[in-house]
Amino acid sequence: MSETPTSPNQDLPEAPQAGPLSQWLTSQGFDHQILGNDHLGIERLGVEPLALPLVATALKSKGFDYLQVQGGFDQGPGEPLVSFYHLVQVGGSDGASTAEVRLEVSLARDGDLTVPSLYPLFRGADWQERETFDLFGINYSGHPHPKRLLMPEDWVGYPLRKDYVQPDFYELQDAY
């Protein structure tokens, strides 16, 4: 049996290409990572926590003035936690279509889990950032209401983390 020899570069995944928003941000001097497009073709850009308000402000000035969703996800045990903002340009530059972009901030789970809040820029981030804090433990500095939204104030842990250990005992409060 003969196997075809493969070159070492043949097995490497192709690096994501810069999309139009990435190219525009680069031309404006904003540092970011090209994460490629998601399954719907939406451009994903990685930004450092301190650069998030600057990049979001630049995108808002370009017409991405609607925060469709903010959330978080856990990439798995030992992997980073991610806070993301999905921005939409309604009407697009041609007046008819829409454009979308997702900003992602990766945070080492054993490091500083703080991201500047985008509440001053997008008021709709209020409850969404609180929910992400509540379920993943990502803090949003500068948020005007930094408290739990879904879980009781004395709840220990963050239920949507993949390393979360569910408590064995629940004390139910009597409604009467």
UniProtKB/Swiss-Prot annotation:
Q: How does the entry describe its membrane topology?
A: Peripheral membrane protein
Q: Which Gene3D superfamilies match?
A: NADH:ubiquinone oxidoreductase, 30kDa subunit (3.30.460.80)
Q: Which GO terms describe its cellular component?
A: plasma membrane-derived thylakoid membrane
Start-end of Polar residues biased regions: 1-10
Which cell locations does it reside in?
Cellular thylakoid membrane
- The kind of enzyme this is, by top-level EC class, is translocase
SUPFAM superfamilies linked to this entry: Nqo5-like
Q: Has keyword NAD?
A: yes
A Pfam family reported for this protein in Swiss-Prot or TrEMBL: Complex1_30kDa
Q: Which UniProt keywords apply?
A: Membrane, NAD, NADP, Plastoquinone, Quinone, Thylakoid, Translocase, Transport
* InterPro entries named among the record's database cross-references: NADH_DH_suC, NADH_quin_OxRdtase_su_C/D-like, NADH_UbQ_OxRdtase_30kDa_su, NADH_UbQ_OxRdtase_CS
GO BP annotations, alphabetical order:
photosynthesis, light reaction
* Cysteines joined through disulfide linkages: none
The reactions it catalyses are:
a plastoquinone + NADH + (n+1) H(+)(in) = a plastoquinol + NAD(+) + n H(+)(out); a plastoquinone + NADPH + (n+1) H(+)(in) = a plastoquinol + NADP(+) + n H(+)(out)
Keyword Thylakoid found: yes
Q: Where is this region: Disordered?
A: 1-22
From the Swiss-Prot or TrEMBL record, what is one GO molecular function term? Answer: NADH dehydrogenase (ubiquinone) activity
Q: What does this protein do?
A: NDH-1 shuttles electrons from an unknown electron donor, via FMN and iron-sulfur (Fe-S) centers, to quinones in the respiratory and/or the photosynthetic chain. The immediate electron acceptor for the enzyme in this species is believed to be plastoquinone. Couples the redox reaction to proton translocation, and thus conserves the redox energy in a proton gradient. Cyanobacterial NDH-1 also plays a role in inorganic carbon-concentration.
Q: Which PANTHER family match?
A: NADH DEHYDROGENASE [UBIQUINONE] IRON-SULFUR PROTEIN 3, MITOCHONDRIAL (PTHR10884:SF14), NADH DEHYDROGENASE UBIQUINONE IRON-SULFUR PROTEIN 3 (PTHR10884)
HAMAP family hit by this protein: NDH1_NuoC
What subunit structure does UniProt give? Answer: NDH-1 can be composed of about 15 different subunits; different subcomplexes with different compositions have been identified which probably have different functions.
The UniProt entry's sequence similarity note says: Belongs to the complex I 30 kDa subunit family.
Protein name, per record: NAD(P)H-quinone oxidoreductase subunit J
Annotated source species: Synechococcus sp. (strain RCC307)
Q: Taxonomic lineage per UniProt?
A: Bacteria, Bacillati, Cyanobacteriota, Cyanophyceae, Synechococcales
